[in-house]
Amino acid sequence: MKITVLVENSTSCRLYGEHGLSVYIEYDGKKYLLDTGASTLFAKNAKELGISLADIDTAFLSHAHYDHSGGFEAFFKENDKAEVYMQDTSAENCYFRTETGDKYIGIPVQLLEAYKERFHTLHTVCEVEKGVWAVPHSTENLDGMGRRAHMYRKVGDEFIADDFAHEQSIVFETEKGLVIFNSCSHGGIANIVREVQNAFAGKKIYAVIGGFHMMKLSGLDTL
């Protein structure tokens, strides 16, 4: 397995950075993309690194936020074959709510409709390719974490605390053990590890990679 971060919130003199994440993964002779960051910067960085987006076989959307889905239109322009797997609860309805107002933080509006033939939805633990699994949340009452983070979903005219049912982990089986990718871990990294342990009973976890959203936080409840 080879992992290359295409974009994140830190950078070098050669590459661009932004608030968001995109990861390129080579595994068992195939090429995978996890998220596309917030814009086209992931594609610019891929070109600088000599990575061809056209050669990617399969892609994943970790969850329904703009900073992980904002570059998919650029990806589709360069790649005409890869299917994108997401949870069936993913929609264009995520908001950040504070006393000063509501800010839309979801998937770019109308992206899912415009490219509906490229997006495929899942709703349970699923082996997408040999040794590559999508694992949704199974922990209950995660809406409390959404409420604390001021994150909500708009359902009709009502705002509901986000329980992050649209978030999924991508798990690769390797000789050393399971490698878990979760781009933001909104559902709590401890919950995520436990969910994977339950889904793969008896299998060793070798690594957990992604974003944990733990900066400036304290206390075990943030895990």
Model-predicted segments: where are they?
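Metal-dependent catalytic neighborhoods of phosphoester/phosphodiester hydrolases
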Residues: 70-79, 103, 218-223
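Cap/insert and terminal regions of metallo-dependent hydrolase folds
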Residues: 66-68, 83, 161-169, 173-223
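Active-site-proximal loop/helix segment associated with metal-binding centers of metalloenzymes
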Residues: 98-102, 112, 124-176
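Pre-active-site segment of Zn-dependent metallo-hydrolases
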Residues: 16, 30-58, 146, 151-155, ...
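Active-site metal-binding motif and surrounding structural segment of the metallo-beta-lactamase
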Residues: 41-92, 198-209
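Active-site environment of divalent metal-dependent phosphoester hydrolases
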Residues: 13, 41, 65-69, 91-94, ...
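Conserved beta-strand hairpin/beta-sheet module of binuclear metal-dependent hydrolase folds
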Residues: 1-49, 163-182
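Hydrophobic alpha-helical segments and helix pairs
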Residues: 82-123
